[in-house]
Amino acid sequence: AAVVVTASHNPPEYNGFKVYWENGAQIIPPHDSGIAAEIDLATTKPLPLMSLDDAKQQGLLVWLEDDYYQSYRQTMNENALLTPDSNTDISIAYTAMHGVGADMAETLLADAGFKKVASVTEQREPDGTFPTVNFPNPEEAGAMDMVMALGKSVDADIACANDPDADRFAVAVKRPDGEYQMLTGDQVGSLFGDYLLEQQPNSLVGNTIVSSRLLSSIAKAHGAQYYQTLTGFKWLTNIAMEKETEQHPFLFAYEEALGYTVGNKVWDKDGLSAIVAFSQLTGKLKAQGQTLWDKLEALYRQHGFYFNAQRSIALDPKSPPIGDKLRATPPKNIAGKKVAITEDLKTSVKTYDDGSEEAIDLPSSDVLIYHLEDQSRVIVRPSGTEPKLKCYYEVISDFPDNMSYEQAQQAAEAKMNELIDAHQKSL
């Protein structure tokens, strides 16, 4: 077992304490509550202390030296999904966002044959005060500004970022007009899914319940197995180990919050292998005379234009719990569309509009999922700690041949805005 302490993009008072089990994945029940109970017990006992020097001499403290990093590097270079090829003629802008990713990201990209890699100098070295960004989370507006500006100055094909502890990966792609546009986690996850399944079709891929269903459709088209879990990478990796077989080995999993794992070398989200794989995808497309936008459009034309959004809604603190209200009077329609299926993960029951029911094979969680008759989906997650509701929306629009990408995007956005407005008014 192992522990990783990291604040990453969170404020320093919220240092993360991540516990990994012997299988290399983060812990799930019953280990989480078992360890928490032991921690509580430890607070009631005297705490034996030892100096760092003594601990080191007794072999109780082992500093991770360069050989540790080289073993990770070697493992990544031996990952069959990251095998270098000749399609490396792309330009990459990169930022470590004042975190720890730069050395390894640059090393792995060089190992894979990418020679045109420019790093944002001001953000390259670790600095816990994060002086150049308001909030060092690549999902936040403005966090990618410097790497996109660098991308523009070197005419990069992609402008990439790791978050400060380098487990997440974000990318902005050059548009035909020369500007850079961020891809969403779902867009990156779908591109990855298709690209990796082309290499290894009969595989197992998965994502979380709040991520896009496009991956499920892509998996089906490749004859692959698809699975879905609760949010959190601990579920994606532990369930993957349970579900994979010789016929369907685990290939890839992602969550919409920019977390990806490529292959079975790291049983957690890993922003470093992700940047290598995404650069290889970009290089392969460029060698074929295509861009990432072309590929995304082709996926949308094949499967439908999937569009996702999420909102946080503040609720009246004096009103009764929203989950109780929604369960007492389940909505029959949302935005004028009939609710065809309701999934209640708290009771693990899926209810169809004809009243029939079936069990849901997921751990219990305070989440409600509504599938509408037009294939739209609304997911409602009440906060356990404050009067707040997190809502995740997905719409699927037609994308016929006579429609441009811009028109399809506008149609999906209009459909999404209508759904969000109507749903929020109904709460």
Kindly give the residue locations of the regions a language model identified.
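Ferredoxin-reductase
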Residues: A1-E22
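Short beta-strand micro-motifs enriched in acidic
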Residues: T6, R381-S383
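Gly/Ser/Thr-rich loops at beta-strand to alpha-helix junctions
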Residues: N10-P11, A96-A102, A166-R168, S211-R213, ...
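Short acidic, glycine/serine/threonine-rich loops at helix termini
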Residues: E13-V19, L47, D103-L108, T129-V133, ...
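Gly/Ser/Thr-enriched, mixed-charge loops and adjacent short helices
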Residues: N15-L150
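Phosphate-binding and adjacent anionic-ligand microenvironments
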Residues: K152, A156-I158, E179-Q181, P201-R381, ...
